[in-house]
Design a protein with these regions (language model features):
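C-terminal and late-domain segments of enzyme folds
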Residues: 1-37, 56, 143, 147-240
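A conserved helix-loop-beta module that forms one wall/lid of the active-site cleft
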Residues: 337-407
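Conserved ATP-binding module of the ATP-grasp superfamily
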Residues: 370-372, 390, 394-397, 408-443, ...
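ATP-dependent carboxylate/phosphate-activation module, predominantly the ATP-grasp catalytic core
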Residues: 415, 435-501, 505, 512, ...
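Catalytic nucleophile loop
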Residues: 98-100, 121-140, 326
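N-terminal beta1-alpha1 cap of cysteine-dependent amidohydrolase-like domains
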Residues: 1-96, 100
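Peripheral (often C-terminal) accessory segments that flank ATP-dependent C-N-forming ligase machineries
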Residues: 555-642
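ATP-binding N-terminal substructure of ATP-dependent carboxylate-amine bond-forming enzymes
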Residues: 240-349, 627-641
């Protein structure tokens, strides 16, 4: 069922449905989808079922409006007291149900009498509410006083049980009611504002509307939220608001993550930040894209984090997303989601599968994805020695739960293995050992929607492993490809499916074999290394933007708000990254690089200290048209004096 909640589908005085905010075109598209392009059977549901004169005038007016809007119909029927007994068959045969405007309590009573809530179960057409009809779609209907005497009547019921099609409570016809009074009480300041301390209402001018698809509401046009005794604008004309509350954890680090907040806010999401920095010390770009902020003393103190989320939930209502997009906080994100019943991300019971390298193996196997052989350090020195004898040296020791190259070591023989165990005698059980595989390190980076479908894909290539860059203090050079190789896309998608991941940015690492390896594959095949359920680190998201002329931060935000990509992708190119070291003497200066690459140079800046071990001290990013140009860029930028 597709639902439209309107004050009125027309602007005042217009003879047809308004085209503002794309309303008429959207309704026509929904009707065509519901009927297969055939004229719909329309059922109007009266708000005054016993007032024949009023009901007949509404039938004529709505019929004229529908036809003036260019919508052909098979039939238009009014459901009121006269044919109430036929309600089941009328609803069953309708393609388009319109809940008419009028007196909310009167219509509400009639809807219950005909048992409309039950009749709508399984309805797959279009339902449109007008004024009272929209208000009665809510689970709990806010029936604010409207007629003389209602505001001062102690028996008048402001809260009614509705159709439970939405939890959105509307105060329609903003232009007409903003300064209206009932029984000498101002409707907003004296009635709605006080009632909003424990509720949240939305109000907009005629021409605005809410569309609900697959249970997800989106508001179109200028609108205001009334809550906690005040009114604030939540959406502007010709823009959308998604009724979502997103808690973004540590939005100030990495430094580019404010773009995620900006993208979500642009989509009408309420962006609520939690960090351990004073608000005034947050970057201006971030502050401008936060709707609220809660400072904790320590982001690792779960009790403080729990209180922060609880405070937002009390103030803003149901929390829809909790996200950091940061490997370090994945476990805490999952725990908070689980404790607050936020179902849009990974829960506690699945976190080990994406954090522990030993657990990852099980899911790789489910997807038929080859991986390096592995043994847990907890098996002990003797068994790890036997493992190394079977696979051959070198072997790689790495934390079972860890990110980046931290704690990773290449062990070349029994002597180095024994020394490693001696040095790690207190925590060797926290490590795993894997056979050493030679090949090209590549990544499959993608954003997936809630259906497990990729809405954006990218491939980056890392000719020198991060472990080697860190341990040898090398320059960092890697690139983003123009396209994702078909075989990599296939194994990347299979991996995501095996891990059961949806609604996420993913960064999956693979080795592309440089020779045939028994049990793993042929030269050129891909072998699973590890999964990272977050965006790639460092400047890679920016490189993806440059490579594909898009905005991956916005695409992620589109996934959050709309479950689809709305940001287009342009013509693709190669984008290369060079991270130079302050400790090295280069033949070509900073200015030489800028002069040589000119407009091809997309970015050059100092790398944050926290990232410099991996990425170098000075970053240069260039957009080029061929792999040969990328290699020439690397050679020129990293050439040193002998």
């Amino acid at each position: 069922m597709t639902i439209y909640l309107t004050g009125s589908p027309t602007r005042y005085g217009e003879p047809s449905f308004t085209e503002d905010n794309g309303f008429l075109a959207d309704v026509k598209a929904s009707l065509a989808k519901a009927t297969g392009g055939h004229p719909p059977r329309v059922l109007l549901v009266s708000a005054a079922p016993d007032d024949r004169g009023f009901t007949d005038s509404v039938l004529k007016g709505m019929s004229d409006c529908i036809h003036c809007s260019g919508i052909e119909t098979e039939s238009i029927t009014m459901l009121d007291r006269r044919n109430a007994s036929q309600a089941p068959s009328l609803v069953e045969n309708a393609h388009w149900i319109i809940l008419c405007g009028g007196h909310v309590p009167t219509q509400n009573k009639f809807l219950h009498e005909i048992n409309l809530k039950s009749l709508l179960q399984g309805f797959k057409g279009v339902l449109m509410g007008c004024s009272a009809g929209s208000m009665n779609c809510a689970g709990t209907v806010y029936s604010h006083p409207e007629l003389p005497g209602e505001a001062v009547d102690p028996e008048y019921k402001r809260w009614l049980k509705g159709l439970e099609l939405t939890d959105i409570q509307l105060v329609p016809h903003l232009d007409q009611v903003r300064y209206a009074s009932v029984d000498n009480l101002r409707l907003f300041e004296d009635i709605a504002f006080p009632d909003s301390w424990n509720h949240r209402f939305y109000t907009f001018r005629d021409g605005g509307y809410v569309k609900i698809t697959d249970g997800k509401p989106t508001l179109y046009g200028e609108a205001f939220e009334i809550s906690r005794g005040a009114m604030r604008r939540v959406c502007e004309e010709n823009k959308t608001y998604s009724f979502m509350n997103l808690i973004f954890i540590s939005p100030h680090f990495p430094q580019t993550y404010w773009h995620f907040c900006a993208g979500a806010k642009a989509n009408g999401v309420n962006v609520l930040g939690i960090a351990d920095t004073n608000y005034e010390n947050l970057p201006l770009e971030l502050r401008q894209n936060l709707d609220d902020y809660y400072k904790v003393d320590n982001l690792e103190d779960y009790e403080q984090m729990y209180r922060a989320v609880a405070w937002f939930a009390h103030k803003w209502g149901k929390i829809d997303w909790i996200e950091s997009n940061n490997e370090y906080w994945l476990e805490q994100d999952a725990r908070l989601r689980t404790d607050f019943n936020v179902t849009t991300g990974i829960q506690t019971d699945h976190i080990a599968a994406i954090k522990n390298k030993s657990e990852m193996k099980k899911y790789y196997a489910l997807g038929g994805i080859p991986t390096a052989r592995q043994i847990k350090g907890a098996e002990g020195l003797a068994k790890v020695k036997a493992f190394a004898k079977k696979t051959g040296y070198p072997i790689i020791a790495k934390p079972d739960n860890g990110m980046g190259a931290g704690g990773t070591a290449k062990l070349r023989d029994d002597k180095e293995l024994e020394a490693w165990f001696k040095e790690r005698q207190n925590d060797f059980a926290l490590y795993v050992f894997e056979e050493f595989i030679t090949g090209l390190l590549v990544s499959y980076d993608a954003i997936y929607n809630s259906k497990g479908e990729p809405i954006f894909e990218n491939n980056s290539v890392f000719p020198t492993p991060v472990m080697e860059i860190v341990h040898k203090n090398l320059d960092c050079c890697y690139w983003t490809n123009k396209t994702v190789p078909a075989k990599l896309a296939a194994i990347g998608r299979r991996t995501v499916k095996a891990f059961g991941i949806k609604s996420r940015f993913v960064h999956l690492e693979f080795f592309q074999l440089d020779r045939d390896r028994e049990g793993l594959g042929k030269k050129g095949d891909y072998v699973g290394l590890e999964v990272n359920m977050r965006p790639p680190g460092g400047y890679t998201p920016d490189m993806m933007d440059y490579a594909h002329q898009t905005d991956v931060f916005q695409i992620w935000a589109d996934m959050v708000a709309f479950d689809e990509a709305r940001k287009p992708v342009g013509e693709s190119a190669y984008v290369g990254y060079v991270g130079r070291r302050d400790s090295r003497r280069y033949k070509h200066s900073h200015q030489d690089l800028l002069d040589r690459y000119g407009q091809a140079m997309c970015m050059c800046e100092r790398v944050p200290y926290a990232l410099s071990d991996d990425l170098g001290d000075m970053a240069y990013i260039a957009r080029l048209q061929s792999k040969a140009e990328i290699e020439a860029f690397f050679k020129y930028a990293t050439e040193e004096y002998a």
